[in-house]
Design a protein with these regions (language model features):
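Membrane-interface extramembranous regions at the lipid-water interface
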Residues: 1-29, 71-86, 105-132
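Binding-site signature for planar aromatic cofactors or substrates
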Residues: 50
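Hydrophobic alpha-helical transmembrane segments in multi-pass membrane proteins
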Residues: 18-45, 53-75, 85-108
Length: 132
């Protein structure tokens, strides 16, 4: 699975390891990218401060949208790995209880060991062995 499919497609399954690695990477990477783009914006020295401010807001919105979309896709894929509907993402809108439930289900519990209705196991379990 390519990194764009991993981060921006809600289809398929991912294992816990990949879920945590991507969550940590994007939690660090998106703010770093945001501040790097803002620094670049400051170095360009646009003529109007209003234009600079508008571009800064647009950069912030794009970074935020990227973060949220990738978060949704990663969590939906973890629900799929647990053989549950991606609509369970909506449980995050229940304060505290929904957050804890999602953390335990998606971040701590193992996925379905073999193929399920959302695809084959990301660990390769339950598949035919192929010699060549």
């Amino acid at each position: 699975m390519s990194w764009t499919d991993m981060l921006f497609s809600p289809y398929g399954r991912i294992r816990r390891r990949d879920f945590w690695l991507w969550m940590i990477a994007k939690t660090i990477g998106v703010p770093v990218l945001f501040f790097a783009l803002l620094l670049l914006l400051k170095l360009i020295h646009l003529k109007s401060p209003d234009t600079e401010q508008l571009i800064g807001v647009i950069i912030m919105m794009v970074c935020w949208a990227t973060f949220v979309l990738s978060n949704i896709c990663l969590i939906v894929k973890r629900w799929h790995d647990r053989n549950k509907s991606g609509w369970l993402y909506l449980i995050l809108f229940i304060p505290v209880l929904g957050w804890i439930w999602t953390l335990v289900e998606c971040g701590c519990l193992d996925g379905t060991p073999a193929r399920n209705r959302y695809g084959k196991s990301p660990k390769g379990l339950g598949e035919e062995a192929r010699a060549f």
